[in-house]
Curated annotation (Swiss-Prot):
GO terms for molecular function: deubiquitinase activator activity; molecular adaptor activity; molecular function inhibitor activity; ubiquitin protein ligase binding; zinc ion binding. Adapter protein involved in I-kappa-B-kinase (IKK) regulation which constitutively binds TBK1 and IKBKE playing a role in antiviral innate immunity. Acts as a regulator of TRAF function by maintaining them in a latent state. Blocks TRAF2 binding to LMP1 and inhibits LMP1-mediated NF-kappa-B activation. Negatively regulates NF-kappaB signaling and cell survival upon DNA damage. Keywords: Acetylation, Coiled coil, Cytoplasm, DNA damage, Host-virus interaction, Metal-binding, Phosphoprotein, Zinc, Zinc-finger. Changing E262A: No effect on cleavage by Seneca Valley virus protease 3C. Residues 1-31 are annotated as: Necessary for interaction with ZC3H12A. This is TRAF family member-associated NF-kappa-B activator. The record marks E272, F273, Q291, G292 as: (Microbial infection) Cleavage. Pfam families: TBD. Ubiquitous. InterPro entries: CALCOCO1/2_Zn_UBZ1, TANK, TBD. One of its GO terms (cellular component) is cytoplasm. Residues 133-172 are annotated as: Interaction with TBK1 and IKBKE. The modification Phosphoserine is found at S126, S129, S178, S208, S225, S228, S341, S354, S357.
């Protein structure tokens, strides 16, 4: 019994399972068919809408053609018939025939108008709604576009006005530089660049510092750069108001009188010394008197220029007085000068003379300048003027004249000493 029941249950389960599978397959097939049908329906609806639009276009074209044909048929043929009949009439025909002909012409004209009017009404009714709808849409889009373009134009104009108010032209900074001659194409520009200015008395030999700042320097480095450049004779490029710098004029030396006087004195000294070596002291004194040059000033200037210049055949005129030998000289020979001549050499090439050699002095910044007090050290007497010098009376070593500081000045004392050299005493 149990086996039979189990077999029956298995069969029933298999049948139920098969029925469920058939149901599922039927449902799936139904879904696929419905989807296919819906897709076909959509495609057919699209085709119908497309065909409807084509039909509407064809109807509109047909209405336009019919309207043109009706206008031509209603006006032109009637005129032709009336004109031909009127032209064919003769004066011999009776008046009644003319009246009857006109009446005949009016009858077909009225009939044609009655036939054409229902056609126009039907065409307007059939195609009036789609044409009016399309025309309304076109007009609406046109006016929308026109309004949008008008807004864009107004906005662009407002932006232009606002930018023109905000746009301030920047003033270009003028750079201080010289324009070469070959870069100017017009003659008036060249003449304007090289026109002589009012500042013609500027000494080109002296070091000049312009307001041109070197490139790559900050504001805090500008002062130090000027201090370093002030030690040299640096020539900066000319500015617009200083174009005379480009003229090919010979430069004037900074100090003319001492250089020329020393050159003349040197030539005359060499000639006189070769002719008569014994009288070279007097010759040198007369040369200084002829040129009108202070020997002390010439000697000091010569000492200052020894480190800056390098002449080849000049003579170092080192002026020395005989203050320490004043007791041995007669009273009238105080104007004699002893000139020690040595060829001027470069400090690197010149041999170092011994300190014990008489009549020679070591060149360089350590060389002492002539002092009216030979017995004192160089540190105790300073020509620049100190507080101790203001209270010490000055005594002339030539004539033993006393110059108290309360009455006389340092300039008076120096002029008195210069009078001894020029032979005024």
């Amino acid at each position: 019994m149990d086996k039979n029941i189990g077999e029956q249950l298995n069969k029933a389960y298999e049948a139920f399972r098969q029925a469920c599978m058939d149901r599922d397959s039927a449902v799936k097939e139904l879904q696929q068919k419905t989807e296919n049908y819906e897709q076909r329906i959509r495609e057919q609806q699209e085709q119908l809408s497309l065909q409807q639009t084509i039909i509407d276009k064809l109807k509109s074209q047909l209405l336009l053609v019919n309207s043109t044909q009706d206008n031509n048929y209603g006006c032109v043929p009637l005129l032709e018939d009336s004109e031909t009949r009127k032209n064919n009439l003769t004066l011999d025909q009776p008046q009644d025939k003319v009246i009857s002909g006109i009446a005949r012409e009016k009858l077909p004209k009225v009939r044609r108008q009655e036939v054409s009017s229902p056609r126009k009404e039907t065409s307007a009714r059939s195609l009036g709604s789609p044409l009016l709808h399309e025309r309304g849409n076109i007009e609406k889009t046109f006016w929308d576009l026109k309004e949008e373009f008008h807004k864009i134009c107004m906005l662009a104009k407002a932006q232009k006005d606002h930018l023109s108010k905000l746009n301030i032209p920047d003033t270009a900074t003028e750079t201080q530089c010289s324009v070469p001659i070959q870069c100017t194409d017009k003659t008036d520009k060249q003449e304007a660049l090289f026109k002589p200015q009012a500042k013609d008395d500027i000494n080109r030999g002296a070091p000049s510092i312009t307001s041109v700042t070197p490139r790559g320097l900050c504001r805090d480095e500008e002062d130090t750069s000027f201090e370093s450049l002030s030690k040299f004779n640096v020539k900066f490029p000319p500015m617009d108001n200083d174009s005379t710098f480009l003229h090919s004029t010979p430069e004037r030396p900074g100090i003319l009188s001492p250089a020329t006087s020393e050159a003349v004195c040197q030539e005359k000294f060499n000639m006189e010394f070769r002719d008569n070596p014994g009288n070279f002291v007097k010759t040198e004194e007369t040369l200084f008197e002829i040129q009108g040059i202070d020997p002390i000033a010439s000697a000091i200037q010569n000492l200052k220029t020894t480190d800056k210049t390098k002449p080849s055949n000049l003579v170092n005129t080192c002026i020395r007085t005989t203050l320490d030998r004043a007791a041995c000289l007669p009273p009238g020979d105080h104007n004699a000068l002893y000139v020690n001549s040595f060829p001027l050499l470069d400090p690197s090439d010149a041999p170092f003379p011994s300190l014990d050699s008489p009549g020679k002095a070591i060149r360089g910044p350590q060389q002492p300048i002539w002092k009216p007090f030979p017995n004192q050290d160089s540190d105790s007497v300073v020509l620049s003027g100190t507080d101790s010098e203001l209270h010490i009376p000055r005594v002339c070593e030539f004539c033993q004249a006393v110059f108290p500081p309360s009455i006389t000045s340092r300039g008076d004392f120096l002029r008195h000493l210069n009078s001894h050299f020029n032979g005024e005493t």
